[in-house]
């Protein structure tokens, strides 16, 4: 049984998808034991509390540099015996020490079909705005392992989502979450926990 930490920065809709999947018994080889937020007061912490999962806050601005932030985050993960880290809308960049401590054990969900609309600055509505501005007919989501390159780790799963006439970035974001992110992320986590993906 792998202990899973989910790192969040906002409302936690992907966290909720993971919690719901776990409650349905879809990941018998892993359990979410910790939710780490990058700032206090985010709704994701309420979701964690409602599910009986411990939540804590590790804020980048509380540390003088990224190395000390990474050390604090790593201490938090190690103290909770975390085996697998899932980035679910976590907006702080993980440093080399965290990535090195969890090789092929950090997953991220990205709201586009990597290698399109990814990399530094491509988060939130921006990938959807970029897909619409480019005139794309499809977009989607990607779950990948995290390495030192932003959105550059090995891809585990992808799912395409149609872009429809009249879509706004907000409408497209909601469709990508519902049709791709909330399905792919729990599936990828279960596959890693079962050893199907190593």
Locate predicted features.
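Charged helix-capping and loop-helix junction motifs
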Residues: 68-74, 123-127
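N-terminal Rossmann-like dinucleotide-binding module
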Residues: 1-43
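Donor/substrate-binding cores of folate-linked one-carbon enzymes
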Residues: 84, 88-197
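Short, surface-exposed acidic-centric catalytic microdomains
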Residues: 28-68
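Short acidic active-site motifs
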Residues: 43, 72-73, 94
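Glycine-rich phosphate-binding loop signature in dinucleotide/nucleotide-binding domains
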Residues: 76-83
């Amino acid at each position: 049984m792998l202990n899973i930490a989910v790192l969040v920065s906002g409302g936690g809709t992907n966290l909720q998808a993971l919690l719901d999947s776990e409650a349905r018994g879809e990941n018998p080889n892993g359990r979410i034991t910790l939710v780490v937020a990058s700032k206090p007061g985010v709704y994701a912490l309420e979701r964690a509390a409602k599910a009986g999962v411990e939540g804590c806050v590790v804020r980048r601005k509380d540390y003088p540099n990224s190395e000390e932030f990474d050390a604090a985050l790593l201490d938090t993960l190690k103290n909770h015996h975390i085996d697998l880290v899932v980035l679910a809308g976590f907006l702080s960049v993980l440093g080399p020490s965290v990535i090195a401590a969890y090789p092929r054990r950090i997953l991220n969900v990205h709201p586009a079909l990597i290698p399109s609309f990814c990399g530094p600055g491509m988060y939130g509505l921006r990938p959807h705005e970029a897909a619409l501005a480019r005139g794309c007919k499809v977009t989607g989501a990607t779950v990948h392992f995290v390495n030192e390159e932003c959105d550059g780790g090995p891809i585990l799963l992808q799912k395409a989502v149609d872009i429809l006439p009249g879509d706004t970035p907000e409408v497209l974001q909601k469709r990508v979450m519902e049709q791709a992110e909330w399905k792919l992320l729990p599936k990828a986590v279960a596959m890693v926990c079962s050893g199907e993906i190593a």
